[in-house]
Amino acid sequence: MPGKGDAPVLPGARAVARYVRISPMKARRVVNLVRGLPAKEALTVLQFAPQAASEQVYKVLASAIANAENNERLDPDALLVSEAYVDEGPTMKRFQPRAQGRAYRIRKRTCHITVVVEAVAPAAPKKAAAKKAAPAKETTPAATESKTEGAE
């Protein structure tokens, strides 16, 4: 039951990719590009983003759109990326042998990518009821002449 002051719940869908073998910081860079964009525009941005993580985020976003279309019967053109975040997953630890019997630790980081899309009602056309600005006082040559005549 929604509490007092809660925002209205919009229809939408979500998709989660867990244990993705990408560093969470690198995935967050890509997710920040698409948060708040319309879903179709976000797909285009991800398609041409040079980062390696954009491929995984693209798949998650496409899955969220498909979930909204097939499970919730929503129009894919009216979807907006309302939430997109990356959580840290487990880190696999490996050792890299080094000289003199040493070993350096290698951290293979994973992340969980979550994308939520919501249907947005088409925006009502705004009325062009812009108030007319008061006309600026114009100084005409006749007005300036009358002022200067009295000063002589």
From Swiss-Prot:
InterPro entries: Ribosomal_uL22, Ribosomal_uL22_bac/chlpt-type, Ribosomal_uL22_bac/org-type, Ribosomal_uL22_CS, Ribosomal_uL22_sf. The keyword Ribonucleoprotein applies. SUPFAM superfamilies: Ribosomal protein L22. Coiled coil: none annotated. Residues 124-152 are annotated as: Disordered. Keywords: Ribonucleoprotein, Ribosomal protein, RNA-binding, rRNA-binding. GO terms for biological process: translation. Residues 124-145 have a biased composition (Low complexity). One of its GO terms (cellular component) is cytosolic large ribosomal subunit. The keyword Glycoprotein does not apply. One of its GO terms (molecular function) is structural constituent of ribosome. Part of the 50S ribosomal subunit. This protein binds specifically to 23S rRNA; its binding is stimulated by other ribosomal proteins, e.g. L4, L17, and L20. It is important during the early stages of 50S assembly. It makes multiple contacts with different domains of the 23S rRNA in the assembled 50S subunit and ribosome. The globular domain of the protein is located near the polypeptide exit tunnel on the outside of the subunit, while an extended beta-hairpin is found that lines the wall of the exit tunnel in the center of the 70S ribosome. Belongs to the universal ribosomal protein uL22 family. This is Large ribosomal subunit protein uL22. The gene is rplV.
